[in-house]
Amino acid sequence: MPKSYTDELAEWVESRAAKKRRRDEAAVAFLAVRADVEAALASGYALVTIWEHMRETGKVKFSYETFRSHARRHIKAKPADVPAPQAKAAEPAPAPKTPEPRRPKQGGKAEKPAPAAAPTGFTFNPTPDKKDLL
């Protein structure tokens, strides 16, 4: 007797779930070889060379773009060695002075800005003059 469609569908979903890779599988694999990658980079090897070797030896199974993004995120983005905090100076450095914006006076006439010079060259006029047309 043939299986019903729902039984076939249930088997297919289960087999597909078993084959489906985890999203973080590449990150976990990279973190497992992170120390090796750091040592190889410190020795002067290129990132693509390190990835090719690890791919051939089976240490990583993901693309170079993924490898590169994990290297950037987990190795190259680390902050540089921060020096030990020094004792605070007795006087803090003076803050740079910024000029205060000019405000118009409350009473009297408000200053009018100087009219801008007429632009030279082409200017678009949406309502053309009849005399300017051919």
UniProtKB/Swiss-Prot annotation:
Keyword Ribonucleoprotein among record annotations: no
Compositional bias of kind Basic and acidic residues: 99-112
Region feature Disordered, mapped onto this chain: 74-134
Keyword Nuclease: no
Domain of life according to the entry: Bacteria
Keywords of this entry: Plasmid
Pfam families: DUF5338
Skewed-composition ranges (Low complexity): 83-92
Name used for this protein in its record: Protein TraK
Organism: Escherichia coli
Recorded name of the encoding gene: traK
